Amino acid sequence: LLVQIDGLNLLTDPHWGQRASPFSFAGPKRHQAPGIPFDKLPAIDAVVISHNHWDHLDKDTVQALMTAHKGIRFYVPLGIQHWFKTEIKGSVLQGPAQNVVALDWGQQASLKGKTKKLDLHFLAVQHWSARSIGDRYETLWGSWALMHPDFKFWFSGDLAYSPDTQDIGKRMGGFDLAAIAIGAYEPRWFMKDSHINPSEALQVQKDVNAKAAIGIHWGTFDGMSDEPLDQAPKDLELAKKESSLEVNFVVLKHGQIWQK
């Protein structure tokens, strides 16, 4: 997502690669083109990364952003800064030129907007991390709350349903908009501890007290899970009809704009 708040341009888990995989010839392949061509991006001020899975952290994309956008800063879960140090040219982990900031759960950082300050909070959800067979849980994972006096936004990252989302709602006091993952949920016996389904996404919106929500994490890479690429929006609409919750939860086309 490209998030624009008070003159700031931020990206969430940017990925312009053709595969969500360590291999160029195998693994989940891109089905849907990015909503914005890379060369059409505005000047990017900051990037937030939710975790290090291959569909969320792409080396070529990160390097291209680091090279093309001077002054960019990456906010990452604790541990991922070491990946930046070894893999991404131009990474600075400390000092006045620092451009990679690692946060623990519950920590926050700030950016100066055009008129007011934007606070970035890194918040725990249930998921996991790994880039290879031997590094599971070595880095953190989580969600991001971008809190501005005029607009409050929550990016879920990947998550399973857990009490964490209720905690986020209580801690942060609610949001104007939440971007909530709705895809990669089948088969449930395998995915339920890692990914919510569309029905659970409705409950997550209620838990975090978001006035509006958009569904993300669907329809982009083929081979991530068992449901068809276009199934998540259909299941979300069905869940909305069956739910007793009154929700404002929509799915945008890739490249479509949501505006407050």
What kind of region is each of these model predictions?
Residues 1-40, 76-157, 176-183, 235-256, ...:
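Metallo-beta-lactamase
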Residues 38-40, 46, 73-75, 79-82, ...:
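Cap/insert and terminal regions of metallo-dependent hydrolase folds
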Residues 20, 57, 84, 130, ...:
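Glycine/Thr-rich phosphate-binding loops of Rossmann-like dinucleotide-binding domains
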Residues 5-52, 60-67, 79, 130-136, ...:
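Pre-active-site segment of Zn-dependent metallo-hydrolases
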Residues 1, 16-18, 54, 127, ...:
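Short, solvent-exposed loop/turn segments at secondary-structure junctions
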Residues 69-74, 152-153:
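Short active-site oxyanion
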Residues 58-66, 201-202, 209-210:
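Histidine-anchored nucleotide/phosphate-binding helix
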